């Protein structure tokens, strides 16, 4: 007699053949019906379970289709051999090392981090309207797009960059991707050799390049940006720079230094390149921006231009773009033509219209007004809290952060600990030392004001003073 451990329920909303299939499959998986077992004939099992032959037949067919049983001619159905499972499952080994429980972090009262932007400035209504129109009118955007990005967005970006950043390129030179890190990782295999990066500088860019097999060397930054003298003696074939707003020092590379840098690259055509990360170029408050390095070099020059919408729109949009020199296009296409695009086509087309119809430039103008007011409020708060010779402010003219150098500063570790205790999220210039060596940039705060609310600015300076006082007291007692 054949017995099921689970009874069939005719009153259930689940069809009987599905109940029978589930019960038999479970018993086969558990080993209750061993592998190799000859299953009862359909009529016999139907009689024993008081169900129709069609019910048993339907359950058997599903079990056979899914590999639980195999039919043998003139013999019946047999449970597949490979379905036999151990009756006692192996114990799961413990983790190699249990992570200690994290201590509760003090709540952040003042967010002075450099990556913050204000989501309230995002153009929600316009963006939503454009996306809705595209969603209903352009179903073709659900299909695959160009690996370099939709041509409409690439053309809109090329036109915008030419007008506002002096970049000289065609749409075919523009590559759209989901973030600067993604684009850098694709660019890395095309680079001819060692890459020089700024120090202090952007750790993320260095890490991405190294993750993709590019050797990096760290070169000093002076009052005019990356030292070309140090670059010339470094043996590097590529340099990664942020000339519009050096991160994190805030230095803007002047025209003379830009010319020197281009001369360095032009001495070895096709063997030297400059990666220009046009970081924060949209936010220049007091003076007109200098033209991009790419614009100075031209479409056939040795400059790869990088930018992103993470600051101008929002980090969650995940749209970055790169302008390749024409001589790198064949290598790019040979390597990446099989790739798929990484940015939603609806997002791409929304941004294309946002730029083409003039919304982007108006949005940037509103952002500049808002962020300039925040910069002014933060500097006023700092100057009210500190004596004139106690705190030196630099890097005020561009971007969404500034530097504050503290006179007779306590150790940076003490400043970090005191800031954390006061609920202040901030960075110090030494955090961006890429050499990992001894501290070279002591006592300098890197203060972002992109995400700080207007109501917080009056207290920001006094809170930072409390941080400095607590750090000094802690240093004395150690």
Where does each model-flagged region fall?
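N-terminal basic, amphipathic alpha-helical segments
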Residues: 1-132, 139-142, 327-328, 333, ...
